[in-house]
């Protein structure tokens, strides 16, 4: 892609864009929540729809001139519904967190009880962490994971639900590598008369491709981001049963947002079309295969993998098992051109800014074209670096990263 107008009119921003392009192309990104949007998605994101204000919904706008914007939003809605086999879709949320806020507004009043996964166990800030708006406005009860298996214990979830009678039960996480029993959660929600919400932001692409169980048949409402495994623009999406459609739409607008971002909705529509192609199913299957390969390799080399493996696109490594903190491991990998994030692990004794683990994901490198054989080699060398911390191994991995990034560029023609 060319940026002639930016280069001419704002050389400072152009230089930063050039540097970011170099960074993305010359490093391997193993951050589980990041991916590479297609150039078609990027074009839509920067399209002329940026200029259009469109408060309201298709055929019910508060501004004139929305005839084409209506068609864009309708197309995005229909594509999302078909992709996930959902009754209703709202494509206006600006982010996953705002999608979650809209759900809370639709079903709850301040002080109502939410039962959700704790941040420490792998949940998300927006599900009721004390520092978040959700944690301040609602009564939050958290479930965690079993100390031995490090997986969700539905018996604990049911016990807490029966004790606290939540109005809303949330399943979904930001750092959980295993399948979630959505049907089991549904049964618990029914026992206490709770709304059941799933935040599938991390796994949405895998769900769309059919390589991960779908929460849509079981949940009253499902939220997600549209980037991550969906490879779309940064944004949010809400899916729900038909009976909740009016409440959800009213909560999004005028509840938590004003005008939608029509250019982002156009980019979402482009991504949803891409996600419906057979090639996306192949890609998503490879994402999971790559993640399983890396997790198995780390474990075989003596790096402890939280829960013992993965069922999706991510894994958590307990790097204290090789004498590192998460912060140290993140910095060590950055030196050789591998990008990860430090991450707390269940029952972590270290503070979040240090952490005992790192989170690793395969969506980005799989989009570039890496397959299980390269992922195995990468995990082997990363493990050796964790254990030896030697300059010789650093040099070897730098060479591997250079070889892989040149063989599999993030964007062809970009450098």
From Swiss-Prot:
Instruction: Name its cellular compartments.
Output: Cytoplasm
> EC number(s) for this protein?
2.1.2.1
| Pathways per UniProt | One-carbon metabolism; tetrahydrofolate interconversion; Amino-acid biosynthesis; glycine biosynthesis; glycine from L-serine: step 1/1
Alphabetic keyword roster: Amino-acid biosynthesis, Cytoplasm, One-carbon metabolism, Pyridoxal phosphate, Transferase
Per the record, the GO terms for biological process are:
glycine biosynthetic process from serine; tetrahydrofolate interconversion
What GO molecular function annotation could you give as one example from this UniProt entry? glycine hydroxymethyltransferase activity
Kindly list the positions at which N6-(pyridoxal phosphate)lysine occurs in this protein. 228
Which PROSITE patterns does the record associate with it? Answer: SHMT
Q: Which cofactor does it need?
A: pyridoxal 5'-phosphate
**Listed GO CC annotations:** cytosol
Predominant localisation class: cytoplasm
Q: Which Gene3D superfamilies match?
A: Aspartate Aminotransferase, domain 1 (3.90.1150.10), Type I PLP-dependent aspartate aminotransferase-like (Major domain) (3.40.640.10)
Q: Which Pfam families match?
A: SHMT (PF00464)
Q: Which reaction does it catalyse?
A: (6R)-5,10-methylene-5,6,7,8-tetrahydrofolate + glycine + H2O = (6S)-5,6,7,8-tetrahydrofolate + L-serine
Keyword Amino-acid biosynthesis included in the entry's annotation: yes
- Site positions (Plays an important role in substrate specificity) are 227
Q: Which residues bind (6S)-5,6,7,8-tetrahydrofolate?
A: 119, 123-125
The record describes the protein's role as: Catalyzes the reversible interconversion of serine and glycine with tetrahydrofolate (THF) serving as the one-carbon carrier. This reaction serves as the major source of one-carbon groups required for the biosynthesis of purines, thymidylate, methionine, and other important biomolecules. Also exhibits THF-independent aldolase activity toward beta-hydroxyamino acids, producing glycine and aldehydes, via a retro-aldol mechanism.
Family under the similarity heading: Belongs to the SHMT family.
List the PANTHER family.
SERINE HYDROXYMETHYLTRANSFERASE (PTHR11680), SERINE HYDROXYMETHYLTRANSFERASE 1 (PTHR11680:SF35)
Subunit architecture: Homodimer.
Q: Give the protein name, as stated in the record.
A: Serine hydroxymethyltransferase
Organism listed in the record = Coprothermobacter proteolyticus (strain ATCC 35245 / DSM 5265 / OCM 4 / BT)
Q: Which gene encodes it?
A: glyA
């Amino acid at each position: 892609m060319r940026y002639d107008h930016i280069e001419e009119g704002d050389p400072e921003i152009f230089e930063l864009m050039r540097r970011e392009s170099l960074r993305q192309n010359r490093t391997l990104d193993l951050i589980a929540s990041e991916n590479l949007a297609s150039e078609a998605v990027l074009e839509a994101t920067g399209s002329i729809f940026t200029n259009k204000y469109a408060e309201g919904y298709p055929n019910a706008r508060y501004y004139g001139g929305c005839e084409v914007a209506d068609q864009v939003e309708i197309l995005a809605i229909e594509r999302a519904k078909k992709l996930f086999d959902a009754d209703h879709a709202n494509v206006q949320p600006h982010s996953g967190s705002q999608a979650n806020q809209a759900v809370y507004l639709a079903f709850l009043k301040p002080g109502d009880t939410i039962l959700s996964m704790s941040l420490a166990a792998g949940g998300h800030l927006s599900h009721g962490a004390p520092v978040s708006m959700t944690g301040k406005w609602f009564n939050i009860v958290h479930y965690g994971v079993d100390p031995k298996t490090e997986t969700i214990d539905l018996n604990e979830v049911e016990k807490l639900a029966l004790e606290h009678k939540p109005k809303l039960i949330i399943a979904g996480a930001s750092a959980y590598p295993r399948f979630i029993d959505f049907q089991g959660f549904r049964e618990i929600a029914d026992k206490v008369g709770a709304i059941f919400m799933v935040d599938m932001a991390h796994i949405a692409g895998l769900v769309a491709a059919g390589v991960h169980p779908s929460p849509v048949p079981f949940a009253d409402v499902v939220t997600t981001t549209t980037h991550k495994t969906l490879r779309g623009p940064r944004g949010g999406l809400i899916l729900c049963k038909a009976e909740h459609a009016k409440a959800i739409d009213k909560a999004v607008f005028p509840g938590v947002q004003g005008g939608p971002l029509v250019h982002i909705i156009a980019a979402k529509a482009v991504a949803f079309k891409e996600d419906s192609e057979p090639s996306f199913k192949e890609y998503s299957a490879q994402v999971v295969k790559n993640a399983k390969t890396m997790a198995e390799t780390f474990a075989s080399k003596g790096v402890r993998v939280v829960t013992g493996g993965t069922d999706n696109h991510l894994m958590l490594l307990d790097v204290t098992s090789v004498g590192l903190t998460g912060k140290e491991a993140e910095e060590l990998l950055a030196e050789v051109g591998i990008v990860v994030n430090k991450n707390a692990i269940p029952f972590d004794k270290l503070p979040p800014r240090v952490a005992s683990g790192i989170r690793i994901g395969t969506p980005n490198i799989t989009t570039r074209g890496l397959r299980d054989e390269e992922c195995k080699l990468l995990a082997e060398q990363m493990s050796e670096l964790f254990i030896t911390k030697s300059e010789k191994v650093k040099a070897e991995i730098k060479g591997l990263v250079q070889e892989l990034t040149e063989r599999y560029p993030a964007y062809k023609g970009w450098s």
